[in-house]
Amino acid sequence: MNIIICDDRIDDRKNLSDLLSDYGEKKNYEFAITEYDSGEQLCEEQSALEACQLLFLDINMQWMDGLKTAMRIKEKYPKLPVVLVTAYMNYALDGYKVKASRFLLKDNLADTIEECMDDLIAEINKNRRILEFRFVEGTIKLYADDIIYIETELHKNVFYTEKGTFQIYKKLDELENELKNM
C-alpha cells in the first residue's frame, strides 16, 4: 500500500512513519511510505498522488496548510482517503469541509493509529480481493490485482507481483483451484 505523509516537522513525520511501519509489520502489510514537508511540494507530485492509496496530512503547516492541501488534492482525487493529523483539537470540525476520512491528534497517535488503520484498510479493501499464501519467503498477503503473472520453474511457481517475486512449492492446478475459491 502506498502511503504519503505530509508534515513540515521532521520529528512528527518520523514518528508517524515508525507507527505505520510497526502496524504493517504487526498486521503483515507492506507499506511504501513517502514523506513530504510541505503541501506545495506534495501538490506538485502528481505521479506520487496517482499511486497514493492513503494520505496523512498535518493541518498546521507553513505556507499551504493541510486543509488547503487536502482541498486541492480532493479536487483531483476525490476518493483518496485523507487522514488529518494535528496537535490542535480546534481543527477537528474543519476536517468535514475536506471530507477527511479521519482526524487524529498527534499526542495520542500511538493509541489511535491501529484502530484508524484497521478501519481505513477495511474500507480500501472492501472492493479488492486479498489473497494469502505461504511462500518460501513467508506468509504474505497480496491483492489479486497486484499479481502480474505466475510462472512455473521446475517444481515451484513464481508469483511476479507489484511487491516483488515470491516462490511457492505447489502444483499449478492446485493454485488455480485456490485462486478460484478465494
Set out the residue ranges of the language-model regions:
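Conserved acidic segment of CheY-like receiver
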Residues: M1-S21, L55
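Short hydrophobic/Thr-rich beta-strand motif most characteristic of the beta2 strand and flanking loop
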Residues: G24-S38, E45
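Short loop/edge segments at beta-strand edges and connector loops
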Residues: D37, L105-K106, K170
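CheY-like receiver
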Residues: E44-E45, L49-K126
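Conserved binding/recognition cores within well-folded domains
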Residues: E115-M182
